[in-house]
A protein has these predicted regions:
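ATP-binding N-lobe of GHMP and related small-molecule kinases
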Residues: 2-127
Length: 127
């Protein structure tokens, strides 16, 4: 499945009944040399790919963060006070929840709820 940003905006509006206030794109990457050495201080020769993951977001009036993905059916909604507790069963939302948890660990106050929609073109790992 391929989508453009207009289709992603429409999908966000269908899911949350409002417009996204920001859209982000994180390109996938491959390492031509140096696989798994970059996070250990080693050298790598990566290149960005034209496919990756999109994130659409807007603040909400609730004290919770809502996570949806167009790639999987599971939808998650967490109170702001739950953002440091991982979800059970290897839930996909644990990845973005972990980002929020690390911000909080570093003293960033998460005081606003958000409605978040993900869509990615990268292959998903299987267990």
């Amino acid at each position: 499945m391929s989508m453009n940003t207009l289709e992603l905006k429409s999908a966000y509006e269908a899911a949350y009944h409002k417009s996204a206030t920001a859209i982000y794109f994180a390109p996938g990457r491959v390492n031509l040399i140096g696989e798994h050495t970059d996070y250990n201080g080693g050298f790598v020769f990566p290149c960005a790919l034209s496919f990756g993951t999109y994130l659409l977001v807007a603040p909400n009036d609730e004290q919770k963060i809502n996570f949806r993905s167009l790639n999987v059916e599971a939808v998650y909604s967490l109170e702001l006070t739950q953002l440091t507790t991982p979800l059970p069963d290897k839930a996909w939302a644990n990845y973005p929840i972990g980002v929020f948890a690390q911000f909080m660990k570093r003293g960033v106050a998460i005081t606003q709820g958000y409605d978040i929609l993900f869509w990615g073109m990268c292959l998903q790992a299987l267990d």
